[in-house]
Amino acid sequence: MTNILKLNAISPLADEIFKNCNYGDKVENPDGIMVRSAAMADYKVGENLIAVARAGAGTNNIPVADYTQKGIVVFNTPGANANAVKELVICELFLGGRKITDAIDWVKTLKGEGDSVGKLVEKGKSSFVGGEIFGKTLGVIGLGAIGIAVANAASALGMKVVGCDPFLSTANALMLSPAVKVVPSREEVYKCADYVTVHVPLTPDTKGMFNAETIALMKGGAVLINNSRGELADADAVISALECGKLARYITDFPSDKLIGVKNAICVPHLGASTPEAEDNCALMAAKQLVDYIENGNIVNSVNYPALSAPKEGAARICVHHKNVANMIAQFTAAVSSAGLNIENMADKSKGDFAYCIIDVNAKPAPELAKTIAAIDGVIKVRVI
């Protein structure tokens, strides 16, 4: 029986997907792991572990590079929480344009004023006048599942939307509203946007992308929304921009000690995907991908290995994780041929320095074949299903 360990509370909808597995939070030496936010840097990897499924988009809590070297596939669930995050961003657009949070805090100070509350409200409300988002320009950095959803929703609310994504796929481009203008550079977005929202992963290239230099390119009084990762923004630069009025608001789903309590900084306690619907969607998607890989060797939505899936066409499937170097395929086919097997179907794809190969054969191979392939220089892991 397949052993699946969950490191966090996972939606019970995943239970049905794992009904034929030993699934729970006390499982030892697992074949697969389900995780949300648990830090895995110090997790001791057992000899059976072949995959980790993150019920969410970000994988910063998982040592992806180390797992890649070990042939452990890391999955995520892009788009499963897109609607939840989109709705939070739309909420934050209103919070950024109108001084709603300040006004709510002020109203709380009127407790105990009795019948005078109404008059005090009418007298004091002018301090909290804000602008509408209709007709304003929203800049969207990153046009993946969430960025597209935000762009389309904002356009439907009457905003002018400008987006930028150097990696925009044809499929994603077709999902964008025709009213959304795509430009080639972030700088073009910064210069025209009244609001800027970012939806990109945290990488060495994106860390600190919102700094003094980039904020200086923005319109005076712009609102910056960051629901992706706190490290995308230089907190000191943001605070300086808020103090001088270059930024009217900074709204983030990732509070930090520096930002908490800063005037015009709104820190939301990481609520982007915190809806029952998003948690269900992420859990189901992660569970299905994990089971499909364990049972069929198919890889869908992996952050460290290439997407490769195909229906089984033989009596057995040989799955090989290997370095992306020359002459690997020839050595695999030679080993299969030497074992007296016919190849019914074969596919190999690469992602950076690593690659993945599936070989469907006409009969179940003897254990020696897996050992022969594993001994080839550059092979990381071999599995026969």
Identify the residue ranges that each predicted region occupies.
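Glycine-rich Rossmann-fold phosphate-binding loop(s) that bind the pyrophosphate
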Residues: 143-144
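A conserved regulatory-domain signal marking ACT and ACT-like small-molecule sensing domains
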Residues: 300, 304-385
